[in-house]
Amino acid sequence: MSFLWAKEFCVLKYPYKLFITHKFSYLLRFETVTLNNIRSPQFYAKLTFSHHQPTVSGTMSTELKFISKYLQISIPETKEGPVSSLFKAVSEQKPELLGNTDFEKAQILEWTTKAFSPIETQSIVEQLDEFLKSSTFIAQDSGISVADLAVYARIHSYICGLSAKEGYKLNNVCRWFDFIQHQESVMEAANSMSMKLANIDLNAPKIQRPSVIKKDKKEKKEGKPSQEASVKSVEKAPKGLEGAKKEKQNKKEKKDKKDKKDKKEKAPKEPPKAATPVPSMIDFRIGFIEKAVKHPNADSLYVSTIHCGDAEGPRTVCSGLVKYIPLEQMQQRKVIVVANLKPVNMRSVKSQAMVFCASSPDKSVVEFVLPPENAEIGDRLTFEGFDTEEPEAQLNPKRKIWEAIQPGFTSGEDLICGYKDESGLHRLFVKGKKDLGFCKAQTVVNGTLS
């Protein structure tokens, strides 16, 4: 494989594949090597940088020192450059941090190089925010890589200095950074270097509205008389016989107008009543779990990356299933998600949906509600008798819609899941694709769904 780095873009080229990566503002020089040798210590010993590589030791030593603390190994800076030294040491001690596939290796090399480059930190953060729209980690699906560690150390002080408003605009980076900084091994390494935790709030900042000053009614009364009052006072002061006749006539005309107005006026309309909660208000969708890991701060929670058909990419979802479902069963599978609950922070990780499960009456068994086999990712689900209505964009917690409807969700004797009311069970199916079949529990009969 040959790495050809140009001033405008980087091309990673090898037989039958071509990748064009992010823009670079500096030049690098690499030896020609094969993909089979990309992990070998000999490759990293040969990896060299041109004179365009930065020589400011303060920035570089921070990344190297942090990763040394994380791996609990010594990484000396050599004449070949920091990335060469780093990759050589990691390949000997923790090769799994350098990627499994060819593409992962290339991504890790690219982002690690950026972390040690003279590119402005703000530019790296903006590129990373775009890159992380559809990823939990920088390169490896399975977890942290050396690129995550290097970039974390590079942008740490920048993220710590962001305001809440600035952080919300970079929500992909901040979500990733918050997840990385709460990993136990990362926290230990950071504490040893006095790197503080960044205070990250992924909620939208409140809009400051100017306060409205109400005028005092007394001031209004004590002010000058209005023009209308002046006219009335003039009308109440008729002069002579002619003035008295005019006053009488005016009073009669006003009375007639008032009578007509009273007849035209209708009874005031009653304010519209709040809609009764119905199951169609909830946005059930087919989701696909790309990967799941254990929550860094909660032993009972998984953190999953789930594709729900959103244009913005996958969602991060926390679920309390550690006690009931093994981690290996949380990977690469279709599930049903509730997609319009208000996002909530669960031990510093924002959860953007909920996995829909069936539980036995005694809560000893909790299992996924299974979607129809041929349902597609992002398909909406609906209930019989409610399939003509659209779900709410987001459920208002104050209206308690979920709390009102959820007790009616159940699995029947035949394991088919639905919403049960006085008229019977309304079965759950893919909207517009009822022929695919109904959603079912795996083993739980007459269970609760939530």
Curated annotation (Swiss-Prot):
Cellular component terms per the entry's GO annotation: cytoplasmic stress granule; eukaryotic 43S preinitiation complex; methionyl glutamyl tRNA synthetase complex
Keywords of this entry: Cytoplasm, RNA-binding, tRNA-binding
Keyword Ribonucleoprotein: no
Compositionally biased residues, Basic and acidic residues: 213-225, 233-247, 262-272
GO molecular function: tRNA binding
Keyword tRNA-binding: yes
Gene Ontology BP annotations: formation of translation preinitiation complex; tRNA aminoacylation for protein translation
Main location: cytoplasm
Domain tRNA-binding: 278-382
Ranges of Basic residues composition bias in the record: 248-261
Family: Belongs to the tRNA-aminoacylation cofactor ARC1 family.
Function: Binds to tRNA and functions as a cofactor for the methionyl-tRNA synthetase (MetRS) and glutamyl-tRNA synthetase (GluRS). Forms a complex with MetRS and GluRS and increases their affinity for cognate tRNAs due to the presence of a tRNA binding domain in its middle and C-terminal part.
Subunit structure: Component of a yeast aminoacyl-tRNA synthase (aaRS) complex formed by methionyl-tRNA synthase, glutamyl-tRNA synthase and the tRNA aminoacylation cofactor arc1 in a stoichiometric complex. Interacts with rar1/mes1 and gus1.
Protein name: tRNA-aminoacylation cofactor arc1
